[in-house]
Amino acid sequence: MTQVFQGRSFLAEKDFSREEFEYLIDFSAHLKDLKKRGVPHHYLEGKNIALLFEKTSTRTRAAFTTAAIDLGAHPEYLGANDIQLGKKESTEDTAKVLGRMFDGIEFRGFSQRMVEELAEFSGVPVWNGLTDEWHPTQMLADYLTIKENFGKLEGITLVYCGDGRNNVANSLLVAGTLMGVNVHIFSPKELFPAEEIVKLAEEYAKESGAHVLVTDNVDEAVKGADVFYTDVWVSMGEEDKFKERVELLQPYQVNMELIKKANNDNLIFLHCLPAFHDTNTVYGKDVAEKFGVKEMEVTDEVFRSKYARHFDQAENRMHTIKAVMAATLGNLFIPKV
């Protein structure tokens, strides 16, 4: 019997059905429970995992490393200075070599096409740790965190505030509407999501009963909010746009005034991290000195408030990544979902 996940890559949310995505979230919760109870789950005993990183990372690298070790696998980190992808060696050739040596490959970098080529030519499961277009492993952690807090996903309303064109916004739109979550993008018109992403989300919403809203009107955006979500105003590779983004996105900051507008004491705040909520970073100090802004996408008050769930969310990166690796590489009996 064909197994649902075995041998598959995890490249973008749109590659999976609602049932498959929800299964991975529930499987993540199961693995989290095993971890908390100290029950071994070495589904990948003897496997070797390549971790390819063009972009720097704290959570993704730590999550893949600890998840692989918990599963009994050996993770091998290959940073930007260790791999030749497209420079001295084509992605196709690199993929064919790594596929002979490793049982699975994680890639975190810029190009979605590159992670797709790794999957096409390596012959082993490839997992997208982040590209400029999509962030699917983040979505499993995000929606697991939401389900842990509300007991469900369908009918929940998530409001994303900030740069509506980035990979996290794309993924929240598609993954959310796939599973019946209402997704509001609160963003300036200049940073609205790409039309094809919104169209895809609207197609999913028709099937799941969710709705999509893209607006720069704060009152429309916060209506019915259960979850506020934000991300950095400047993505990796866009550091030259700090001034422009700070000025453009200041009205879209998640602060206590915005939280109170939702009139929902049970709402939660999420952030994929890192967050610029104070001046305790080099970036934070630099922005404060140059633009007089001490808090960017979220205020320190909200970041440390009772609404905050971002550290639970960060922990869930590990549990959800573990679920993806185990499901696609562990020869588990998952005949259908």
UniProtKB/Swiss-Prot annotation:
PANTHER family assigned: ORNITHINE CARBAMOYLTRANSFERASE, CATABOLIC (PTHR45753:SF1), ORNITHINE CARBAMOYLTRANSFERASE, MITOCHONDRIAL (PTHR45753)
Pathway linked to the protein: Amino-acid degradation; L-arginine degradation via ADI pathway; carbamoyl phosphate from L-arginine: step 2/2
Keyword Cytoplasm: yes
Gene Ontology CC annotation, any one: cytoplasm
Subcellular localization, as worded in the UniProt entry: Cytoplasm
EC number, as in UniProt: 2.1.3.3
Species of provenance: Streptococcus agalactiae serotype V (strain ATCC BAA-611 / 2603 V/R)
Protein name in the entry: Ornithine carbamoyltransferase 2, catabolic
Binding site for carbamoyl phosphate: 57-60, 84, 108, 135-138, 272-273, 317
Pfam families to which the protein is assigned, alphabetical: OTCace, OTCace_N
Gene3D superfamilies on file: Aspartate/ornithine carbamoyltransferase (3.40.50.1370)
GO-annotated molecular function: amino acid binding; ornithine carbamoyltransferase activity
EC class name: transferase
Protein's job: Reversibly catalyzes the transfer of the carbamoyl group from carbamoyl phosphate (CP) to the N(epsilon) atom of ornithine (ORN) to produce L-citrulline.
Catalysed conversion reaction: carbamoyl phosphate + L-ornithine = L-citrulline + phosphate + H(+)
Keywords per UniProt: Arginine metabolism, Cytoplasm, Transferase
Gene name for this UniProt entry: arcB2
Residues annotated for L-ornithine binding in this entry: 167, 231, 235-236
Any one of the GO BP annotations: arginine biosynthetic process via ornithine
Family per similarity comment: Belongs to the aspartate/ornithine carbamoyltransferase superfamily. OTCase family.
